[in-house]
A protein has these predicted regions:
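Active-site neighborhoods of divalent-metal-dependent phosphate/nucleic-acid chemistry enzymes
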Residues: 73-115
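Short, well-structured N-terminal submotif of metal-dependent ribonuclease cores
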Residues: 1-40, 53-60, 120, 132-135
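General small-molecule cofactor/ligand-binding pocket signal
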Residues: 39, 75, 126
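Active-site-proximal, substrate-binding regions of enzyme catalytic domains
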Residues: 25, 45, 52-73
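A general alpha-helix detector
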Residues: 9, 47-48, 84
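Acidic, PIN/NYN-like endoribonuclease modules and their adjacent C-terminal/linker elements
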Residues: 2, 71, 103-135
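Short, conserved alpha-helical segments within structured domains
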Residues: 40-44, 81
């Protein structure tokens, strides 16, 4: 099963944002052990760097990102995904781009804590806890 992991869930893990970090850790453990195929969008990686750069020194942050990216694949956000996001007219453009990335990389689900922003998505959005219960 292939899942696109939304930025907020990745930040829950890497920023140790409790109480959400527990379910995020379980999700990434499934990726690490190969039980699921986890994907983050290319924009998620830049967002993570931007959000954590004031909390973690640069070298440590690069190491954290390298380890993180050894566990998940990076999905492209190219012109096709950007134009698809624009066409969707979603109120949250960033989430529309995530949705398009999920579609183009063949994800079965988008795992996110803000499912309401993905109502118009072609790929079903599901919370980390709901996803873990499905397995």
């Amino acid at each position: 099963m292939r899942v696109l992991i939304d930025t907020n869930v990745a930040l829950d893990l890497l920023g140790d944002r409790r109480p959400f970090s527990e379910s995020a850790a379980k999700l990434f453990e499934l990726c690490e052990t190969g039980k699921i195929d986890g994907v983050v969008s290319a924009t998620t990686v830049t967002d993570i760097y931007y959000m954590l750069r004031k909390m973690i020194d640069r070298e440590t942050l690069y190491s954290v990102l390298e380890k993180f990216l050894s566990v998940v694949d990076v999905g492209d956000v190219t012109g096709g995904e950007v134009f698809g996001a624009l066409k969707s007219r979603n109120a949250d453009f960033e989430d529309a781009a995530q949705s398009e990335c999920a579609r183009s990389c063949g994800a079965d689900y988008i795992v996110t804590r803000n499912e309401k922003d993905f109502i118009r998505s072609k790929v079903q959005a599901i919370s980390p806890n709901e996803f873990l219960e499905k397995l």
